[in-house]
Amino acid sequence: MTKTTQLIPWYRHLNRAQWRAFSAAWLGYLLDGFDFVLIALVLTEIQDEFGLTTIQAASLISAAFISRWFGGLMLGAMGDRYGRRLAMISSIVLFSVGTLACGLAPGYTTLFIARLVIGIGMAGEYGASATYVIESWPKALRNKASGFLISGFSVGAVVAAFVYSLVVPVWGWRALFFIGILPIVFALWLRKNIPEAHDWEARRSEKTPVRTMVDILYRGEHRVINIVLTLLASVSLWLCFTGELNSAVIVAALGLVCAAIFISFMVQSSGPRWPTGVTLMVIVLFAFLYSWPIQALLPTYLKTELAYEPATVARVLFFSGFGAAVGCCVGGFLGDWLGTRRAYVYSLLASQVLIIPVFAIGGANVWVLGLLLFFQQMLGQGISGILPKLIGGYFDTDQRAAGLGFTYNVGALGGALAPVLGALIAERLHLGAALCSLSFGLTFVVVLLIGLDMPSRVQRWLRPEALRTHDATDGKPLSGAQAVSGRKRGLVKSKS
């Protein structure tokens, strides 16, 4: 920005169409968060009505993780070929239809299939909507676009908990799923009347052929093998997450098989830039591993170790969820001010100062605990609001939606693994100590991976001929990866 434009408030750089585009995508994210937590809120009611075992009930939560990676790939590829807007509409229709099916489900099998559909739609929502908003806003405001957008998920989760307390005691658990589809009419109206993303339109005007991930994987020379690998990965994830296997060794082996398949898909679709894509998947995996033990097991910690009543638990969880939502917006401002990676690192380091007091203070003062959780989640969880901006910058426009959707949702499998790790450590330590140690240790891993710009560094180490020295979203130099003139490539510091 010039000095003149810097004097203008940031929101005045956005026109009505850009705000309308953001509103449509944000509402989709709110619905995403709303639908995601519904199953957790009514799991005991569903278990009682259908007579499910604990493993069957838990598998209904895991079902969405089984299909998310595929949804990110397919709907992301749709967004790359046909436009971000169509992929957004398709994704919200999918997870809304899945939500309606949950409310109508006559039994476990139908409910499980509906959760698979929700997982596909949620994954597409993340990749398509994030890419759409980021590409629609001015480059200088794209961290705000990313952070503000992701805040919708946390708001949706808070709204779901509030609606649950009003609806389920009166009308039962099915009514909650029916309510979850009501905003779909407004969202579809908005998305029908919004323009296409600027970057995608500019790319289409070049009239150069576009090969999406679907074209490469399922229409190329290895399509038969890739279809078989897709089925193998899906079955392996189903066996791992539904509790069908009692052997930890077999589960670990299947996990490695899935990892190999996902890396294979990234290598095929990204060509010589595969080191960047694989490293991004690792970053997202660790981002989920450090944050999701607290997200998943905090209610259990409050109930068991602090002996809080349900009303008190709800109050503390509100502080936590609201802090994450505020943190997404704060992260957007920090990202545009300091730069995406620098803001991410500083915010995570600040959160580390608070994580130990959160679990050391005990339960004597609920308000102090709530405030500590608010700020810890604001800094530690909320900064993930700019993760789409961070990931998207490493992909070119013609593969950005699929690259972002696939990378994020493969890494999101860490969200399914994280509670298990927390529970295993809790067998030897108190649950609070387990959550604290996991979050504290793994956060530093993410700090190093992002702070040292490891995607670009690994790219330089393994395939330097495909090293891209500039961020594809903002056109800024990638710190630690800028090529030196001449044959030799080195690492040059920059101001990004």
UniProtKB/Swiss-Prot annotation:
Gene3D superfamilies: MFS general substrate transporter like domains (1.20.1250.20). PROSITE patterns: MFS. It is found in: Cell inner membrane. Residues 486-496 have a biased composition (Basic residues). It catalyses: N-acetylneuraminate(in) + H(+)(in) = N-acetylneuraminate(out) + H(+)(out). InterPro entries: MFS, MFS_dom, MFS_trans_sf, SA_transporter. Keywords: Cell inner membrane, Cell membrane, Membrane, Sugar transport, Transmembrane, Transmembrane helix, Transport. Pfam families: MFS_1. Residues 472-496 are annotated as: Disordered. Disulfide bonds: none annotated. One of its GO terms (molecular function) is sialic acid:proton symporter activity. The chain crosses the membrane at residues 22-42, 58-78, 86-106, 116-136, 148-168, 170-190, 224-244, 247-267, 278-298, 316-336, 353-375, 406-426, 431-451. Signal peptide: none annotated. It is a multi-pass membrane protein. GO terms for cellular component: plasma membrane. PANTHER family: CARBOXYLIC ACID TRANSPORTER PROTEIN HOMOLOG, SIALIC ACID TRANSPORTER NANT. HAMAP family: MFS_NanT (MF_01238). Belongs to the major facilitator superfamily. Sialate:H(+) symporter (SHS) (TC 2.A.1.12) family. Catalyzes the proton-dependent transport of sialic acid. NCBIfam families: 2A0112, PRK03893.1. This is Sialic acid transporter NanT. It comes from Cronobacter sakazakii (strain ATCC BAA-894).
